[in-house]
């Protein structure tokens, strides 16, 4: 490994740089008309730093709804483009929802127990805010005055084009939330509360970005890892490391802290310990094999 402090050599390397290294901005962002500011959550600080005018927030996962909420509270007109999302209450049955997910064992589900691992590793972040007991979802935002539109499908001649599938996307998120709460209730042994379905109002399918209505676009479209510096053939065509539970095809090269590495909670702070213990055993076995091989070679 070449660094600004010299070259390091090691028989094993663990990549713990995570999956949220750089913002994942879609290529159609280059079609945004001149004069409109584009910013990602990584570069956003507060509403006062944005140019005057309305704000179009692209993406309705954790960052998207939090920023839409803050911007609207500051007095900005906000339009929120909603794609696939994971609706989630902050609290359920008197406890934080993460307590239920952990206690019921849902976060302990292993990577070899799911039918579609690739999809499970790319599930959007839950629609949660950090304020205790405060839920912010599409109903809350819409009732407050945030305009909801469908997923951004394209930009043509300065007009943002939105998908017409918003009702179906929201209905699916509501359905999945209901299934999750049913699972928690089955573990708890009693039925709990249920939440009103997402209320849909008529959503425009287009927005003229040249009209002056929008001054800023916030690309809350997630993050991606950046392993471009890794000169080892373990990356797929998208630049993501191919691995089996953190073990790559390159002997001695491991990953940790990635989404659903070995468990649903792998990318959470309290989820790394179990993964680390299992990977350490594999790593130790690799080192033992190296020592044994060197010993046999020397003799």
Where do the protein language model's features map onto the residues?
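Flavin (primarily FAD) cofactor-binding/catalytic cores of flavoenzymes
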Residues: 1-299
């Amino acid at each position: 490994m070449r660094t600004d402090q010299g070259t390091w050599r090691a028989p094993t390397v663990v990549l713990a740089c995570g999956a949220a290294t750089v913002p994942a901005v879609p290529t159609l962002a280059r079609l945004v008309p001149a004069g409109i500011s584009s910013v990602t959550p990584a570069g956003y600080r507060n509403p006062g730093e944005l140019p005057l005018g309305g704000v179009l927030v692209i993406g309705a996962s954790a960052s998207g709804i939090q920023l839409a909420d803050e911007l609207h509270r500051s007095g900005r007109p906000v339009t929120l483009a909603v794609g696939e999302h994971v609706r989630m209450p902050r609290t359920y049955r008197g406890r934080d929802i993460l307590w239920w997910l952990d206690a019921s064992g849902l976060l302990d589900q292993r990577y070899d127990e799911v039918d579609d691992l690739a999809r499970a590793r790319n599930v959007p972040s839950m629609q949660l805010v950090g304020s205790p007991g405060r839920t912010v979802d599409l109903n809350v935002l819409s009732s407050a005055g945030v305009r909801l539109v469908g997923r951004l499908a394209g930009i043509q001649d300065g007009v943002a084009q939105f998908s017409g599938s918003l009702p179906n996307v929201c209905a699916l998120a509501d359905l999945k939330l209901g299934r999750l709460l049913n699972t928690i209730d089955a573990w708890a042994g009693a039925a709990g509360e249920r939440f009103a379905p997402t209320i849909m109002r008529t959503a425009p399918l287009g927005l003229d970005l040249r009209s002056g209505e929008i001054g800023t676009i916030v690309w809350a479209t997630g993050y991606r890892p950046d392993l471009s510096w890794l000169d080892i053939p373990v990356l797929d065509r998208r630049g993501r490391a191919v691995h089996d539970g953190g073990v790559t095809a390159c002997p001695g090269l491991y990953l940790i802290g990635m989404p659903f590495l070995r468990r649903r909670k792998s990318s959470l702070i309290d989820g790394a310990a179990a993964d680390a213990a299992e990977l350490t055993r594999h790593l130790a076995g690799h080192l033992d094999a190296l020592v044994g091989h060197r010993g046999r070679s020397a003799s």
